[in-house]
UniProtKB/Swiss-Prot annotation:
Pathway: Glycan biosynthesis; glycogen biosynthesis
Subunit structure: Monomer.
EC number of the protein: 2.4.1.18
Annotated InterPro entries: A-amylase/branching_C (IPR006048), Branching_enzy (IPR037439), GlgB (IPR006407), GlgB_N_E_set_prok (IPR044143), Glyco_hydro_13_cat_dom (IPR006047), Glyco_hydro_13_N (IPR004193), Glyco_hydro_b (IPR013780), Glycoside_hydrolase_SF (IPR017853)
Keywords, ordered alphabetically: Carbohydrate metabolism, Glycogen biosynthesis, Glycogen metabolism, Glycosyltransferase, Transferase
Phylogenetic placement of the source organism: Bacteria, Pseudomonadati, Pseudomonadota, Gammaproteobacteria, Thiotrichales
Entry protein name: 1,4-alpha-glucan branching enzyme GlgB
Domain of life: Bacteria
GO cellular component, one term: cytosol
PANTHER family: 1,4-ALPHA-GLUCAN-BRANCHING ENZYME
Organism of derivation: Francisella tularensis subsp. mediasiatica (strain FSC147)
GO biological process terms on file: glycogen biosynthetic process
Similarity remark: Belongs to the glycosyl hydrolase 13 family. GlgB subfamily.
A GO term, aspect molecular function: cation binding
Recorded catalytic activity of this chain's protein: Transfers a segment of a (1->4)-alpha-D-glucan chain to a primary hydroxy group in a similar glucan chain
Length: 640
């Protein structure tokens, strides 16, 4: 089995070892020989096409090189009894469009299929694959990759900006190319202080409204924005600006458009044989057969492809619950229990462990993140310790609870105080990322600003309060594009964000400035990220003040030299002479206040130092007395 770190191999020979590992489900570089590859055979240059179709009677390659005609010389030959087919076509070349005509051995019916391993495809509504052999790129991110390999992300800052390339910005209503995005995106991410960008899926998909989560071309770069080299340049530029790149990846299911993977050889092939397991009615897709060796090779090799060829730093694995549970989104009677009578998908569990094991072994510094909405245990526990092996898990519970809380009238918040504190009960059970993602600002859920309670002033104040509380809460961070400058309408994938409001309204400009300053605070204060998953890094001062809806807690660095005190007031009431217990005697300085005038607040800031006094409060021997502004978060730091 070949083992390479970057750039596609143009050597087309399919060795016995490749074939063996492919059918055993252990080949992690299948894209090196599957699909269309440049070849020179008996002194003649051309393209070798290889595909897997175990129930095919015949497969013919048609395309620009033969005027889309079925010809005897372009029929593939079976090279194994388990469904590998291949043919060398001399006059095929880079840039030619092509498809496979696959005839089923039982029905004699034929289907026109795109190449599952194609590196590039036509833009919808066209569906042909495109021979792509010119993919070499000279990278300049060696320093980034060296640093990545040595980085422990658990005790380093991670502040992720999630975005959908097609709607971040457009040009005269048209998609920006990767090269056009290269001119503005890296600089914007860097100036705003985010450490990573998370791209929603970049593989080819026919329906814009699916946002990429119903793919057909798993190996094909999204053609809406350009070609392979353009995407590599964009990632390279991001890395050279010290910005990591995370990719949303969809290994659980696939689009059922007829040119894609569905019934690839005229019968279940990439999907499960049993319709109850294969058909995903909720999403209108088909689920991958994760117990089939060749399908596992397809998917794990795909993960390796994005990491090796595009230097992707992490994969956010979509819809993990759909992989883990046989009864996910299914009523009783619509699913078949496993061999032990349970609802766990044993094949899905084994696949996720194998995926994470392979990436840990071969891709130093690359992370995996689970989007998983149930309470499945040990998702971010290493495989060797009995877990699934992910590095992180999105904290969907925190997101649901806190967004519900922040939408309540402050009069009633005291009755639901547990919504804002409960997350710390289970926080250390997983390596959580606090995520406010695209899913929370679509389908009638309202934009983030419109989730906030009250009139316009209170909405803005509530947003600043909430985001400051989020920065202080243990766990890495993620926010969806548009929230940082207060987009009032829900996200729409068919148009660009409302960037014009930043120039038109001072409140939007002030909030954008707030996010930048908040991100600066996060990046500069070790206490906010060094002990996210260590009990030492967080301590409540007062978690029980439900009557006033005030939270207070301490964040600490490993060496205890840096301590930050957060006070979050979730009511529109100013509290004067508020006594707060503190861990150390000395003077404290306000280092952040979400009520600052420059952010659009009322300007109730503390310009002078605050000295502690030897009076017991909240279980501490020292206390300070402060004024807490309305709907605001204060951050204090011990300075001496």
């Amino acid at each position: 089995m070949k083992n390479k770190n970057s750039e596609q191999n143009t050597h087309s020979t399919i060795g016995e070892q490749d074939i063996h590992y492919f059918h055993e489900g252990k080949h992690i570089y299948a894209y090196e020989f599957m699909g269309a590859h440049k070849a020179c055979e008996e002194g003649i240059e051309g393209i070798r096409f290889t595909t897997w179709a175990p129930n095919a009677k015949s497969i013919c390659v048609i395309g620009d090189f033969n005027y889309w005609q079925v010809e005897d010389k372009n029929y593939m030959e079976p090279i194994t009894d388990a469904g590998l087919w291949s043919v060398f076509i001399p006059n095929a070349k880079n840039g030619d469009k092509y498809k496979f005509v696959v005839t089923n051995k039982d029905t004699n019916n034929y289907v026109y299929k795109s190449d599952p391993y194609a590196f590039f495809s036509e833009l919808r509504p066209n569906t042909a694959s495109i021979i792509t052999t010119e993919t070499q790129y000279t990278w300049s991110d060696d320093k980034w990759l060296e640093k990545r390999a040595k980085t422990n992300y658990y005790d380093n800052p991670m502040n992720v900006y999630e975005l959908h390339l097609a709607s971040w910005k457009t040009k005269n209503g048209k998609f920006l190319t990767y090269d056009e995005l290269n001119e503005t995106l890296p600089q914007y991410i860097k100036e705003m202080g985010y450490t990573h960008v998370e791209f929603m899926p970049l593989h080819e998909h026919p329906l814009d409204a699916s946002w990429g989560y119903q793919p057909t071309g798993f190996y094909s770069v999204n053609s809406r924005h350009g070609d392979i080299i353009g995407l590599k340049r964009l990632v390279d530029k991001l890395h050279n600006n010290d910005i990591g790149v995370i990719l949303d990846w969809v290994p659980g299911h696939f689009c059922k458009d007829q040119h894609g993977l569905i019934y690839f050889d005229g019968s279940p092939c990439y999907e499960y044989q049993e319709p109850t397991k294969a058909i995903n009615k909720g999403w209108g897709t088909h689920n991958f057969d994760l117990g089939r060796n060749e399908v596992k090779c397809f998917l794990i090799s795909n993960a390796m492809y994005w990491i090796n060829e595009f230097h992707i730093d992490g994969l956010r694995v979509d819809a993990v619950s759909n992989i883990l549970y046989l009864n996910y989104d299914r009523e009783d009677g619509q699913w078949i229990p496993n061999i032990y009578g349970g609802h766990e998908n044993l094949e899905g569990i084994a696949f996720l462990k194998e995926l994470n094991g392979v990436l840990k072994h071969t891709c130093k510094g690359v992370i995996t993140i689970a989007e998983e909405s149930s309470s499945w245990p040990d998702i971010s526990t290493p495989v060797e310790k009995g877990g699934l092996g992910f590095d992180f898990k999105w904290n969907m519970g925190w997101m649901n609870d806190t967004l519900r809380y922040i939408s309540l009238d402050p009069v009633y918040r005291k009755y639901h105080h547990n919504l804002i504190t409960f997350s710390m009960v289970y926080h250390y059970s997983e390596k959580f990322i606090l995520s406010i993602s695209h899913d929370e600002v679509v389908h009638g859920k309202k934009s983030l600003i419109n989730k906030m309670w009250g009139d316009l002033w209170n909405k803005y104040a509530g947003l600043r309060l909430y985001m400051s509380y989020m920065i202080g809460h243990p766990g890495k961070k993620l926010i969806f594009m548009g929230s940082e400058f207060v987009q009032f309408v829900e996200w729409r994938e068919y148009e660009q964000l409302q960037w014009q409001v930043v120039d038109q309204y001072e409140s939007h400009k002030q909030t954008l400035h707030f996010f930048k300053k908040l991100n600066d605070l996060y990046h500069n204060e070790t206490a906010l990220w060094q002990c996210d998953y260590d009990h030492h890094g967080f301590r409540w001062i007062d978690a029980d003040n439900s009557q006033q809806s005030i939270l207070s807690f301490i964040r600490s660095s490993k060496d205890n030299k840096q301590k930050l005190i957060f006070i979050c007031n979730f009511t529109p009431v100013t509290y004067y002479d508020y006594h707060l217990g503190v861990p150390d005697a000395g003077s404290y300085k306000e280092v952040f206040n979400s009520d600052n005038l420059e952010f659009g607040g009322s300007g109730q800031v503390m310009a002078t130092e605050i000295f502690s006094s030897p009076q017991s409060s909240h279980g501490f021997e020292q206390r300070i007395t402060i004024k807490i502004p309305p709907m605001a978060t204060l951050v204090l730091k011990l300075i001496k």
